[in-house]
Amino acid sequence: MESSFHFINEALLITQTFITFHQFLVASACVLIAVFGYYFFKPRCIIYLIDFSCYQPPDFLRAPVSNFIEHLTISGVFDQESLDLQQKILERSGISDDASVPATVHEIPPNASISAAREETHEILFAIVQDLFSKHEIDPKSIDILVSNCSLFCPSPSITSMIINKFGMRSDIKSFSLSGMGCSAGILSVNLVKDLMKIHGDSLALVLSMEAVSPNGYRGKCKSMLIANTIFRMGGAAILLSNRKQDSHKAKYKLQHIIRTHVGSDTESYESVMQQVDEEGKVGVALSKQLVRVASKALKINVVQLGPRVLPYSEQLKYIISFIQRKWGMHKEIYTPNFKKAFEHFCIHAGGRAIIEGVEKHLKLDKEDVEASRSTLYRYGNTSSSSLWYELQYLEAKGRMKMGDKVWQIGFGSGFKANSAVWKCISEIDSRGRNAWSDRIHLYPVCGDTSSALKTELLS
C-alpha cells in the first residue's frame, strides 16, 4: 500500500516538474519574442533638419586680394619671399575678392587677441542664431540640446556658454563645445545630436559650426604654415534639428545616414594637418604636401562603408565583379560606382580647389555636381566646417533642391577624418527664401574661375 502511494507521489512530482519546465519554455519564448519585437519594430529615432542659417558678412569686411597683400606688406611681419608665396597662393586659390575676414584682421597689424576672437564669435553666432529663432518664432528656452564646434578657438567660458548667456536658455540644457576636430566637425556635431536624441525623446537641438579666423594667423616663414593664412575666411552656420513628430511637417530634410572615418592610426594622415610651433617659436597650422592623397585614402574607406547603404544593387554588383576580376588579373582598375544613381546633389567641403577637384576625379563627378562647392569657395573662401551648409544653401537658392532629392555632404578634417552625411529633402524648398546667397545667386556659377583646373603646385 505504501509503495502505491510512493509511486503516486513520484508521478505527481514528475508532472509538477514537467509543467514547470513547460511554463519556463513558454515564458522564455515570450521574452525572446518581446526582445526581438522591440529591436525590430520599435519606433526609429528620426532626425529632422527644420532649417539652418549661414552668416553673411557685411560688404565692408570684404578682403580683396590686393588689399589682403597690401595689409600683409604694411604689417611688416613677413619677408618678401613669404609675401610672394602668399600672393601666389591667393591668386590660384579660387577665392574671390568678395570673401571676408573679421574687422580685427583688417587692423594693421591684425589683432589676434582673445578679445578679438570673442568679438568675431559673437558677431557670427549671435546673428545666425537670432535669424533662426526669429524666422521660426522659437523660444530659446525650448532648446534642449546645444552643440558647438570651433576647432582652434576654445575659450573659457565655452562657446555654448556664450549662447546660453546671450539668449537666456534653460539651466538644464545639455550643452557640448567641441574643439580640435577640424573642418569635418559639423557632421560630427550632427552625429552627437543624433546619439543624444536616441536617449532624449521630443527634443529640439541647435548645432553651431564655425572657425575663428582672428587668433589663428601665422606670422612666420614656414611655407606649409603660410597656406592657412590665405584660404580661411569668416563664416558660420546654425542648424536646427528635432526628433519631435510634430516638427516633421515643417522640416526641410530628414537624416538618412552618417558615416565617420578616422585614419589617425596612420602617422602620415595624422600629421597631414597639424597645429605646431615653427623654429622661431611661432604657432600655425601646417598643411602637408600629402594632404590630397590622405584625403583620398580616407574618402575611399568612408565610401566603402557608405556604398552598401545607398547604392542600387546593380552598382554594387558591378563593383564586386570588377573587384574579383582585378584579383584574378583580368582588370587593372576597380569599377567606381556611379553615386549619381544614389544622390541628386553633392556638397564637398570647400577646403581648397585641389580637394574639390580630387573628390570630383575620384568619384567621377561632372562640373555641375561640384558647382556648389566651387561657388562656395569662390564667394566665401574656406569657412571650415560651415562650408557644407553654405553649399546646401546654394543648391536651395538655385532652385535645384526638390522634394525627395538626396544630398551627400562630404567633410574632411584634421586627425585625419572623412565624414559623410546623407539628407533627404522632405518639403518643397522655396528658392526665393532669404539666405546667404539671395542677393547674388544670379551671378553664379562664375565662368572661368569656378571651373578651371588647378595645378597642385602650391607646396612645391
Curated annotation (Swiss-Prot):
<keyword id="KW-1133">Transmembrane helix</keyword>
<comment type="pathway">
    <text>Lipid metabolism; fatty acid biosynthesis.</text>
</comment>
<dbReference type="GO" id="GO:0016020">
    <property type="term" value="C:membrane"/>
</dbReference>
<dbReference type="InterPro" id="IPR013601">
    <property type="entry name" value="FAE1_typ3_polyketide_synth"/>
</dbReference>
<dbReference type="InterPro" id="IPR012392">
    <property type="entry name" value="3-ktacl-CoA_syn"/>
</dbReference>
<dbReference type="GO" id="GO:0009922">
    <property type="term" value="F:fatty acid elongase activity"/>
</dbReference>
<feature type="active site">
    <location>
        <position position="262"/>
    </location>
</feature>
<feature type="transmembrane region" description="Helical">
    <location>
        <begin position="21"/>
        <end position="41"/>
    </location>
</feature>
<dbReference type="InterPro" id="IPR013747">
    <property type="entry name" value="ACP_syn_III_C"/>
</dbReference>
<keyword id="KW-0012">Acyltransferase</keyword>
<dbReference type="InterPro" id="IPR016039">
    <property type="entry name" value="Thiolase-like"/>
</dbReference>
<dbReference type="GO" id="GO:0006633">
    <property type="term" value="P:fatty acid biosynthetic process"/>
</dbReference>
<feature type="domain" description="FAE">
    <location>
        <begin position="38"/>
        <end position="328"/>
    </location>
</feature>
<feature type="active site">
    <location>
        <position position="382"/>
    </location>
</feature>
<keyword id="KW-0808">Transferase</keyword>
<feature type="active site">
    <location>
        <position position="349"/>
    </location>
</feature>
<keyword id="KW-0812">Transmembrane</keyword>
<protein>
    <recommendedName>
        <fullName>3-ketoacyl-CoA synthase 7</fullName>
        <ecNumber>2.3.1.199</ecNumber>
    </recommendedName>
</protein>
<dbReference type="Pfam" id="PF08541">
    <property type="entry name" value="ACP_syn_III_C"/>
</dbReference>
<keyword id="KW-0472">Membrane</keyword>
<feature type="active site">
    <location>
        <position position="345"/>
    </location>
</feature>
<dbReference type="Pfam" id="PF08392">
    <property type="entry name" value="FAE1_CUT1_RppA"/>
</dbReference>
<feature type="active site">
    <location>
        <position position="183"/>
    </location>
</feature>
<comment type="similarity">
    <text>Belongs to the thiolase-like superfamily. Chalcone/stilbene synthases family.</text>
</comment>
